[in-house]
Regions:
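Flexible, polar/acidic helix-loop-strand segments at domain edges
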Residues: 93-165
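C-terminal structured "cap/appendage" subdomains that terminate the fold
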Residues: 185-257
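Extended, compositionally biased alpha-helical segments that mediate assembly or anchoring
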Residues: 276-300
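Structured, solvent-exposed acidic/aromatic patches
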Residues: 1-60, 149-165, 178-186, 198-204, ...
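An aromatic- and glycine-enriched ligand-binding surface/loop that stacks and positions planar moieties
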Residues: 1-125, 239
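Surface-exposed intrinsically disordered loops and tails
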Residues: 76-78, 249-264
Length: 300
């Protein structure tokens, strides 16, 4: 609704030339190797001090890291942290979206996530007799290395990245498109695509939505985007219906037998998926009791 105002501000940021897209290895863009790079716009500093590790106490990396208690990482040369809870699990439909846009050998795809076959070649496998919630894909740009956690799994000196220039470019592409400035929208979109080694394309809202989904996956913008775009009902209508289980059914002395199966725990359709009412939270009952003129949000 305020696309012109937004476009003006974002175009000023772009015209200032204070920021540019990081041109190092894309896989390092969120790691300690690329702290305070030219793309970082808002970043929290964390200090490498093993003698005061509790000052960096955080479960952030542990939650984002793979579900390590279900994995055999003995062949990985100790390069990955051995403690992870596996909360950051890419879905197959995200991988498929990458492949459709970039191909199986896509540069950004392969520096963003790894398939099970790829991760097993790095010495990380599902342990025999174990299973975890996963469709066979592992987030790579959020990998938790031992180097960045010298005092234990609860700490890391890798900085938090809250916003980077690629997000500004994609916001600018959207704002300019809605404001009628097609050439500026094209330029912003294709600056991101060029870094991803993709051909230029005309900026449409669908193209911008896709690019943002791929470029910023695992960076906590997706849910907010699909809420404001009013896409959540369509995209999340079946969320939670089935649970993917990646298992290694091999016995101790048997060759690995790893496969994904889907289990449906939720039979009642009212208990899973995004509904129209979820765009707004319910107003607490106490507030309604205190103010009889207040009406509850629809669906609650």
């Amino acid at each position: 609704k305020r696309c012109n105002e937004v476009a003006v501000v974002l175009n000023e940021v772009r015209a200032s030339s204070k920021y540019k897209l990081y041109d190092g290895n894309y896989e390092d863009i969120l790691t300690y190797k690329a702290e305070y790079n030219c793309e970082s716009m808002l970043e929290s500093n964390r200090i490498f001090d093993a003698s005061n590790s509790m000052d960096e106490f955080s479960f952030f990396e542990v939650m984002n890291h793979w579900r390590t208690d279900k994995l055999d990482m003995s062949g990985s040369n100790n390069q990955f942290n051995g403690t992870g809870w596996g909360f950051m699990v890419p879905q197959k439909k995200l991988y498929d979206a990458f492949v459709q846009e970039e191909g199986v050998d896509g540069y950004r795809l392969n520096q963003t996530m790894k398939t099970y076959d790829q991760i097993s070649q790095l010495g990380v496998k599902v342990a025999k007799g174990q299973s975890l919630i996963n469709e066979g894909y592992f987030m790579w740009k959020r990998r938790f290395s031992n180097v960045e956690s010298p005092a234990g799994f609860w700490c890391s000196y890798n900085n938090y990245r809250w916003m980077r220039y690629a997000e500004v470019l994609l916001l600018a592409a959207e704002a300019n498109l809605k404001d009628g400035n097609q050439s500026e929208a094209d330029a912003c979109l294709n600056e991101v695509r060029q870094r991803a080694r993709l051909d230029a394309k005309t900026a449409t809202l669908d193209a911008i939505k896709l690019e943002k989904r791929l470029e910023l996956c695992s960076e906590y913008t997706r849910y907010q985007d699909i809420i404001r775009w009013k896409d959540a009902e369509a995209l999340l209508k079946d969320q939670g219906e089935r649970t993917p289980i990646l298992s290694n059914k091999a016995g101790k002395d048997e060759p690995d037998n790893v496969a994904v199966e889907y289990i449906q725990y939720n039979k009642d359709k009212t208990r899973y998926g995004f509904k129209e009412r979820h765009y707004l939270l319910p107003i607490p009952a106490k507030e309604i009791r205190l103010n009889p003129n207040m009406e509850q949000n629809a669906g609650w």
